Amino acid sequence: SYSPDRYGHQPFAGDDLTQPNEPYWAHVDRVFKEAGRLGFLLLVAPAYLGADKDGYVDLLKKAGPPRCREYGLWIGKRYRALRNILWVHGGDRNPWDVKDEVRALAQAIREVDEQHLHTAHWANGTAAFDTFGDEGWLDVNSSYTYGPVAWRILADRQGVPPRPTFLIESH
């Protein structure tokens, strides 16, 4: 599940990724524009998976890869002109049960938005490249640990070829 915006608007009509609710997304547009004006880089999760039932997992499962791809094309086109975003796929859990859906979404965004970088955020003790490291759409590694940070970052930098790595979540 997911929360409405502060005005009570849900992101999608009828829990359908392919039916964006324009008032919700107009609010997102205003927030993104203001963040850009202030010089913020936004880490944008187009479909936050959630630590438990607080994310989009059920919605992605219901949609399946074809509808996730359609949503990815839509959101990628909508925000490709912005200069201040980094796409972050996943969020607080491993994507095993929605791996094909996450892949379809990410590849679709990349198809229409070649300028922005992509990373992913999985469960504690993992890095983005642990799941999709060999796929062309994943540009930047991110590490998530509540353990020793230096060890995790050094381990994650050992990939071939080496790619940039940053700490996305810790204590």
Question: Over which residues does each language-model region extend?
Answer:
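Active-site mouth of glycoside hydrolases
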Residues: 1-151
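Hydrophobic helix-cap positions at the C-terminus of alpha-helices
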Residues: 79, 156-157
